[in-house]
Amino acid sequence: MKYLKHLSDAADREAIKALHDERQTWVNQEKKGFLRYREPYLQLARFKADSINLENDVVTIGHGEQISHEEQAEIRQALRAYMPWRKGPFAVFGVDIDAEWRSERKWQRLEKHLPDLKGKVIADIGCNNGYYMFRMAAQEPAFVLGIEPSVQHYYCFKALEEMSGLTNLEIDLLGVEHLPLFTESFDVVFLMGIIYHRSAPIETLRAVLDSLKPGGTLILETQGIPGEQPYALFPDKTYAKVPGTYFVPSASCLINWMHKAGFIDVDLFCDHPMSPEEQRQTEWMEFESYKDFLDPENPELTLEGYPAPHRFFVKATKKM
């Protein structure tokens, strides 16, 4: 737990350590559901990149000339154990991974709005395989903690991080619900693709606020619906075929949530409609994707008949 030393004195280190130990006992069980991801991680962790590139759209770890053709085939097979790849792109020892999401486009939209990350302590909530953490690492933060409850994403990130040789990134099997343990610990929190999965979004935002240091920054990205009025869609069972979706806000509704949670300087700096060019089926994600979630006769509606999603980007501050 490299990240403990970076937390504030107000953080509940004892409870965090106990929770970490409990989750490690759980994830290290000798069961198929864990071994299917642990075994390729151990296989991949043997390879150490002699170079990395985190500044370009493709997170590049190692290069093909560093290894044999047989080793590259082994790496490719192990990486495919983590399908479907949702975030990317990556290039790992010459193996190109074209993920479902064109995550570099999201990064391009938000990068110029970021605070200075150099020397900062950062949390990426729901970090998935860590694509954005690697992009953050290019700016030399003191530390980035990825909070991610999925075993698949946990081991995928650990494999990539081990191969990269980076020492200022770490992932833990936690969820956004554990943020109250991290009082005033982070300079910057990224909360992307999370808030619409929370049944009490304002409570979640308040937990994020409490986890930030005074003057800290929240970068929030979410799906939402078009419209000028401050309302949120509350879908019946699914929204764009995604279960576990609670409130899907309009832009003004989201801004109101942020203010009611206690944030200041709330800036919605990007609002764009979703596109099947940005979320699509690939060799590394072979299941249904965005175009399959829309009404085939009217792409401005989801299959359920709801307004098709926009994506909103918001930057906000915790007062000093």
Swiss-Prot record:
Report the source organism.
Answer: Desulfotalea psychrophila (strain LSv54 / DSM 12343)
InterPro entries, alphabetized? CmoB (IPR010017), Mo5U34_MeTrfas-like (IPR027555), SAM-dependent_MTases_sf (IPR029063)
**NCBIfam families hit by this protein:** PRK15068.1, tRNA 5-methoxyuridine(34)/uridine 5-oxyacetic acid(34) synthase CmoB
Task performed by this protein: Catalyzes carboxymethyl transfer from carboxy-S-adenosyl-L-methionine (Cx-SAM) to 5-hydroxyuridine (ho5U) to form 5-carboxymethoxyuridine (cmo5U) at position 34 in tRNAs.
Instruction: Please identify the protein, giving its name as recorded.
Output: tRNA U34 carboxymethyltransferase
Q: List the CDD domains hit by this protein, alphabetically.
A: AdoMet_MTases (cd02440)
By its UniProt entry, which Pfam families does this protein fall under? Answer: Methyltransf_9
Q: Which UniProt keywords apply?
A: Transferase, tRNA processing
